Design a protein with these regions (language model features):
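N-terminal glycine-rich phosphate-binding loop and ensuing alpha1 helix
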Residues: 2-50
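Short, high-confidence coil segments that cap the C-terminus of an alpha-helix
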Residues: 43, 91-92, 119-122, 207
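Short phosphate-binding loop-to-helix
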Residues: 47, 53-112
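A conserved hydrophobic position in a structured secondary element of the catalytic/binding core
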Residues: 50-51, 105, 175, 223
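Conserved core of the sugar-phosphate nucleotidyltransferase
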Residues: 105-191
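Conserved alpha/beta core of the MobA/IspD/sugar-nucleotide pyrophosphorylase nucleotidyltransferase superfamily
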Residues: 166-236
Length: 236
């Protein structure tokens, strides 16, 4: 498999749960725990991308691979692009964008996602099964696949007339740098703004993701203070 890189975009002023990336998880902040897990993957390098100087300073306490990005970026994908551009990535370089809300992110899943990008040359992401509670939880992003493993929609709310079966989206994206350049050339999509789902900019412009089932249970996503409390309670 070709070399690949992991970039973790992070910010403190998240609309849904401010400061979650520095939540204390048994002596480590969340972004530190996620970074250490990503380092166990086969990635050539793992980088953190943030527009916040205080968060950058915190991260420099456990890694040198921190890039302070522009405050003008509208989402994590744009921050990932800046890192890749500044590091002179070439079009075929594979980038794995790992969201900073999965404290138990698996390096095996990261390697698998990178292998699928290498194999297909497509936009790729992962999914897992939904629980009944997650089906109606708008903090849980869902996706619907067709029979060719192509994702035909992402959503927060489920709707009755959807063809296909709902899956839980795992917050991890894989693509070649060429797709990141394309992303930056596209206008923001309406659903990107209304749903706060950055991948919809690709989707609404007919660049579709392939979805693959995660090899390892990706664990919970921390999307709310309640999620954090539950995670700590179950892991004490």
């Amino acid at each position: 498999m070709s070399n690949f890189y992991v970039v973790i975009p992070a910010r403190l002023n998240s609309k849904r749960f401010p400061n979650k990336v520095i939540a204390n998880l048994f002596g480590e902040i969340m972004i530190q725990k996620i970074y250490k897990a990503c380092e166990k993957s086969k990635a050539k390098k793992v980088y953190i991308a943030t527009d916040d100087k205080s968060l950058s300073d915190l991260c420099l306490g456990f890694t040198k691979n921190v890039m302070l990005t522009s405050s003008e970026h509208r989402n994590g994908t744009e921050r990932v692009f800046e890192v890749a551009k500044n590091l002179n990535f070439v079009d075929d370089d594979i980038v794995i964008n790992v969201q900073c809300d999965m404290p138990d992110v698996s390096p095996i899943n990261i390697d698998f996602l990178a292998s699928m990008v290498c194999k297909t040359g497509s936009l790729c992401t992962l999914y897992t099964e939904l629980s009944k509670e997650q089906l109606t939880d708008e903090n849980t992003v869902k996706l619907v696949l067709n029979n060719d493993s192509q994702i035909i929609d992402f959503m927060r709310k489920t709707y009755k007339n959807s063809s296909g079966k709902f899956k839980k989206h795992v917050g991890m994206y894989g693509y070649n740098f060429s797709f990141l350049k394309k992303y930056m050339s596209l206008n923001q999509a309406n659903s990107e703004l209304t749903l706060s789902l950055e991948q919809m900019r690709f989707h609404e412009n007919d660049y579709f993701f392939n979805g693959y089932e995660a090899i390892i249970d990706p664990g919970v996503s921390i999307d709310s203070p309640e999620d954090l409390d539950n995670y700590i309670h179950h892991n004490e």
